[in-house]
Amino acid sequence: MSKEIKAQVVVLGAGPAGYSAAFRCADLGLDTVIIERYNTLGGVCLNVGCIPSKALLHVAKVIEEAKALTEHGIVFGEPKTDIDKVRLWKEKVINQLTGGLAGMAKMRKVNVVNGYGKFTGPNTIEVDGEEGKTVVTFDNAIVAAGSRPIKLPFIPHEDPRIWDSTDALELKEVPGKLLIMGGGIIGLEMATVYHSLGSKIDVVEMFDQLIPAADKDMVKVYTKRIKDKFNLMLETKVTAVEAKEDGIYVSMEGKSAPAQAERYDAVLVAIGRVPNGKLLDAEKAGLEVDERGFIRVDKQMRTNVPHIFAIGDIVGQPMLAHKGVHEGHVAAEVISGKKHYFDPKVIPSIAYTEPEVAWVGKTEKEAKAEGINYEVATFPWAASGRAIASDCADGMTKLIFDKETHRVIGGAIVGTNGGELLGEIGLAIEMGCDAEDIALTIHAHPTLHESVGLAAEVFEGTITDLPNAKAKKKK
């Protein structure tokens, strides 16, 4: 017999978008239920995504920094990896955060129902859980059911040596030779981790650069740093994958393809994600789901069914947790009666590689495509005292300005902890700041952060830390 629950709001999915929406609903006085397939809150991001990957990237960074100190007179022995302890560290990080979410849900009196939820009507969702079925009747629903890794039909995904991002983060073993299919953010982050732990890494990417969404000049800095660590096969694609007893054999074609099928101990398929819109029986609620699995929404996150909202990966690109969180707040506030809208000028993107590649607002390629009259100002970290002292002088900070209004419309940073420096640029774009606003803001010295102000000085023609191309010529 099914258990029945009634709620003013039900949130389907407890990733960052979903739990943020549920907690905001509760804070606004709404009786809220949240449905989650995992045993803990946090969704893919906290359990098998953003957070565990950052825990492992921290380990990788420390290993690489220790090796680099040899050049400065500090010599360590070869690191000895206890993979079980590394895994425990990752799990400790996850448990701390998911435990915190459980406490906040309890404090807010959010009812958590574990299991897979599907619509059975415009006001009902049935949850199939370990302890049986639960039917949730709701006044309003917020769909935050996320996405899953893309699978290709010619790849034997059932073989345990064929990984998706979830498998890679389980850290069951460190393969001797690992192929990363896809030179995007997820693939390169995992390449960083497994290289530091001892794997030989091949990366195959069909485009002519890694991280295709970013500008080439920024990616070039990253590629220069890692070209001796990874075997990069650009403008190349996988055509066949065969699982044999002694390994996974991969055939490729393109500019860098090997002549024969290459043997690997494991293959990570990191070619993107697909939304879960078609897994929810959405049609039973009258919801429109497009052919790719996305649910279309307006700026209030409302679907074609007025009392059902959708947020996060399932509503479209970019599939980023921080976008979903803000969408979740908007949906909750609209349900509570507020006239709020999701209308950001910019959404930041970060590849947490080493060095990090981060950008916000217009990229240079986007500005060109849109016919914007723009000007680029860059500050190389080779002129930064802090970067030189910290042994990361190969970084660069770039700002993109509207040439007519002098307003900043985009920015990018490549370098150690580059993602941490992105906030000022995002705020400047949202606030409509021009180059002078940024240049006249006093930035602390010596910091990597001051490179943002110095890039603005380059545009303004007031830079004194570099040769000034805009200086007045002496007679």
From Swiss-Prot:
SUPFAM superfamilies, alphabetized: FAD/NAD(P)-binding domain, FAD/NAD-linked reductases, dimerisation (C-terminal) domain
The cofactor named in the record is: FAD
Keyword vocabulary terms for this entry: Cytoplasm, Disulfide bond, FAD, Flavoprotein, NAD, Oxidoreductase, Redox-active center
Cofactor note text: Binds 1 FAD per subunit.
The cysteines covalently paired via disulfide bonds are: C45-C50
Question: For this protein, what is any one GO molecular function term?
Answer: flavin adenine dinucleotide binding
Concerning InterPro entries, the annotation shows: Class-I_Pyr_Nuc-Dis_Oxidored, FAD/NAD-bd_sf, FAD/NAD-binding_dom, FAD/NAD-linked_Rdtase_dimer_sf, Lipoamide_DH, Pyr_nuc-diS_OxRdtase, Pyr_nucl-diS_OxRdtase_dimer, Pyr_OxRdtase_I_AS
- Where in the sequence is the active site? H445 (proton acceptor)
Judging by the UniProt lineage, the source's domain of life is: Bacteria
E.C. number:
1.8.1.4
Task: Please give the biological process terms from Gene Ontology that the record holds.
Answer: 2-oxoglutarate metabolic process; pyruvate metabolic process
Instruction: State if Disulfide bond is listed as a keyword.
Output: yes
Q: Which Pfam families match?
A: Pyr_redox_2 (PF07992), Pyr_redox_dim (PF02852)
State the top-level EC class: oxidoreductase
User: Catalytic activity annotated for this protein?
Assistant: N(6)-[(R)-dihydrolipoyl]-L-lysyl-[protein] + NAD(+) = N(6)-[(R)-lipoyl]-L-lysyl-[protein] + NADH + H(+)
- Signal peptide span: none
The Gene Ontology CC terms held by the record are:
cytoplasm
Binding-site residues, NAD(+): G182, G183, G184, I185, I186, E205, V238, A270, I271, G272, R273
Q: Report the function annotation for this chain.
A: The branched-chain alpha-keto dehydrogenase complex catalyzes the overall conversion of alpha-keto acids to acyl-CoA and CO(2). It contains multiple copies of 3 enzymatic components: branched-chain alpha-keto acid decarboxylase (E1), lipoamide acyltransferase (E2) and lipoamide dehydrogenase (E3).
**Other facts noted in the record for this chain:** The active site is a redox-active disulfide bond.
List the protein's name.
Dihydrolipoyl dehydrogenase
Q: Which organism is it from?
A: Vibrio cholerae serotype O1 (strain ATCC 39315 / El Tor Inaba N16961)
